[in-house]
């Protein structure tokens, strides 16, 4: 039978519940347990797919095409279990399901209320999510409850967790509460009162936490931990200090050293083998002792909010570990390039244009792509980054000066990138796609396997085929592919059924490393294995740096 660990948060948001939950999962997995994670989001949106990256951060896409919270990305990076749609649900989904049942008459005319109908539905979603785990029936399901204790939106989820714990009985569920212990500079001390009040608020709901994870900018002294223990009624050894670390991959060892996994296993009456965190120690060692260093420019419009590119940043970090190369990411606002030109790119070892949407800043990105192509700087374009690379090539190499995407210019006669529903086939016929089409409307989501063209750089990187996740509405238009190929561009991968371009590259005779991908490879990168595309990209950046350095030395000589 699956046992549950509920992770809640108090005092303030953004303390790192997702990292804490994922780290605990990693430790338990290292002890031989099958583990899955779920994220409960209190907002009323059905999913984060249409939410602004400025408010919500990155939208993480699962293998089965669900648009989910970025914490699911942390889950997949920390454990081997893959996440699915059932691993993340929102208040919006819960109410939608309950209202649908009410309309069908499932409640037999009863008054539908938060208790028991909403809370029962939440429990059903939790159990369904745990049962759908890709690892088989999990020994432990860790459930992260979004929001902060005291928020009105979180109350039904906390009540459902309380009811579920009561229903399942002793040693079947436990609660871990993450709080803030702030350092007050004027007083010169850590303050435990916010944590005391947060636990008090949780106990008012009927939940007594078994473990407290106390976040601070420094290690919490034993006397302060004893004070928190006394006022919160949590054993002192279960008051765990979680201080700021320069890498999230140090957190599993930090929690294990303080006995978190032992406390959880004791509470749930689990007797797994001893933990083996050597993999995490090795990864941290690689991260902290690189042999090389490169600077990669990420050109985008969300550069002030790195949460928007969380998986991408982590994928580059994974490549850093596996190539012994420190990767410095320089965030460059594409609108600044439109105003001031490409001077800010000239010291870079590689250029990356990530996914995005909307017209703002696109001409700056295209200017950056042109610079990378002409200066022979390694370039990686992801999703929109590939589409803009095709547009730049069509304009500046093929000669279609007004080439564009219909996302930015509905009137352009040369629609080299177009919405799926207004897509052209190779004969120039418009292919209409609707909600009933195989692609499911105007968004392509989830994993898709595609064969790779032999003899290409893509084949060197991936092998015979590629299986990556998608999240986009626009596609490279097949009508223009013959002209692009005549100019030298290579379509190195296509979808097997719809014949849609998946990867593009330039031959080495034109450029040493220039690759665009329609999918999002960052979603499948893990610290355990890295990712072949990002490893190749970092290696190309290092090779470019070394060749440039050699040329500069030659000039001085």
UniProtKB/Swiss-Prot annotation:
The active site is at 383 (nucleophile), 520, 522. UTP binds at residues 13, 191-196, 227. GO terms for cellular component: cytosol. Residues 295-547 form the Glutamine amidotransferase type-1 domain. CTPSs have evolved a hybrid strategy for distinguishing between UTP and CTP. The overlapping regions of the product feedback inhibitory and substrate sites recognize a common feature in both compounds, the triphosphate moiety. To differentiate isosteric substrate and product pyrimidine rings, an additional pocket far from the expected kinase/ligase catalytic site, specifically recognizes the cytosine and ribose portions of the product inhibitor. It holds the Pfam family CTP_synth_N. Belongs to the CTP synthase family. It catalyses: UTP + L-glutamine + ATP + H2O = CTP + L-glutamate + ADP + phosphate + 2 H(+); L-glutamine + H2O = L-glutamate + NH4(+); UTP + NH4(+) + ATP = CTP + ADP + phosphate + 2 H(+). It is an enzyme of class 6 (ligase). Catalyzes the ATP-dependent amination of UTP to CTP with either L-glutamine or ammonia as the source of nitrogen. Regulates intracellular CTP levels through interactions with the four ribonucleotide triphosphates. InterPro entries: Class_I_gatase-like, CTP_synthase, CTP_synthase_N, GATASE, GATase1_CTP_Synthase, P-loop_NTPase. Mg(2+) binds at residues 71, 144. This is CTP synthase. GO terms for biological process: 'de novo' CTP biosynthetic process; pyrimidine nucleobase biosynthetic process. CTP binds at residues 13, 151-153, 191-196, 227. Allosterically activated by GTP, when glutamine is the substrate; GTP has no effect on the reaction when ammonia is the substrate. The allosteric effector GTP functions by stabilizing the protein conformation that binds the tetrahedral intermediate(s) formed during glutamine hydrolysis. Inhibited by the product CTP, via allosteric rather than competitive inhibition. Its EC number is 6.3.4.2. L-glutamine binds at residues 356, 384-387, 407, 473. Pathway: Pyrimidine metabolism; CTP biosynthesis via de novo pathway; CTP from UDP: step 2/2. ATP binds at residues 14-19, 71.
């Amino acid at each position: 039978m699956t046992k549950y660990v509920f992770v809640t948060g108090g005092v303030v948001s953004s303390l790192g519940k997702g990292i804490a939950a994922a780290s605990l999962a990693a430790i338990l997995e290292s002890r031989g347990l099958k583990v899955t994670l779920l994220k409960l989001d209190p907002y009323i949106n059905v999913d984060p797919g249409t939410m602004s990256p400025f408010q919500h951060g990155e939208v993480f896409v699962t293998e089965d095409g669900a648009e989910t919270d970025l914490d699911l990305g942390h889950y997949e990076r920390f454990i081997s279990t893959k996440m699915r749609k059932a691993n993340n649900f929102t208040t919006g989904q819960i109410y939608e399901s309950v209202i649908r049942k009410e309309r069908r008459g499932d409640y037999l005319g009863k008054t539908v209320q938060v208790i028991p109908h909403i809370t029962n539905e939440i429990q059903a979603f939790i159990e369904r999510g745990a049962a759908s785990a890709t690892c088989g029936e999990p020994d432990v399901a860790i459930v992260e409850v979004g929001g902060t204790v005291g928020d009105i939106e979180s109350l039904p989820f906390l009540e459902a967790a309380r009811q579920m714990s009561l229903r399942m009985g002793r040693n079947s569920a436990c609660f871990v509460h993450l709080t803030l212990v702030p350092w007050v500079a004027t007083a010169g001390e850590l303050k435990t009162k916010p944590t005391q009040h947060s636990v008090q608020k949780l106990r008012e709901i009927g939940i007594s936490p078994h473990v407290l994870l106390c976040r601070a900018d420094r290690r919490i002294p034993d006397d302060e931990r004893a004070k928190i223990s006394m006022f919160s009624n949590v054993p002192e050894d279960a008051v765990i200090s979680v201080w700021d670390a320069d890498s999230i991959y140090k957190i599993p060892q930090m929690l294990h050293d303080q006995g978190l996994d032992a406390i959880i296993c004791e509470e749930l009456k689990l007797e797994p083998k001893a933990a083996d965190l050597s993999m995490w120690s090795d990864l941290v060692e690689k991260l902290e002792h690189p042999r090389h260093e490169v600077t990669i420019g990420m050109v985008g419009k969300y550069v002030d909010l790195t949460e928007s590119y969380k998986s991408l940043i982590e994928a580059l970090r994974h490549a850093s570990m596996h190539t012994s190369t420190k990767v410095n990411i320089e965030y460059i606002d594409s609108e600044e390039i439109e105003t001031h030109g490409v001077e800010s790119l000239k010291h870079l070892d590689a250029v990356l244009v990530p996914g995005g949407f909307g017209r703002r800043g696109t001409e700056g990105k295209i200017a950056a792509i042109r610079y990378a192509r002409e200066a022979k700087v390694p370039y990686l374009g992801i999703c929109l980054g590939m589409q803009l690379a095709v547009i730049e090539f069509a304009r500046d190499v093929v000669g279609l000066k007004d080439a564009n995407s219909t996302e930015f210019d509905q009137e352009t006669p040369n629609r080299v990138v177009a919405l799926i529903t207004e897509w052209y086939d190779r004969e120039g016929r418009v292919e209409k796609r609707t909600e009933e089409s195989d692609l499911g409307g105007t968004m392509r989501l989830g994993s898709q396997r595609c064969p790779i063209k032999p003899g290409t750089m893509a084949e060197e990187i991936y092998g015979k085929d590629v299986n990556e996740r998608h999240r986009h509405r626009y596609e490279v238009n097949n009508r223009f592919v013959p002209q692009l190929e005549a100019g030298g561009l290579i379509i190195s991968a296509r979808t097997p059924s719809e014949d849609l371009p998946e990867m593009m590259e330039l031959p080495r005779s034109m450029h040493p490393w220039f690759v665009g991908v329609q999918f999002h490879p960052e979603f499948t990168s893990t610290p355990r294995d890295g990712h072949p595309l990002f490893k190749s990209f970092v290696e190309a950046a290092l090779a470019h740096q070394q060749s440039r350095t050699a040329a500069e030395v030659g000039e001085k000589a």
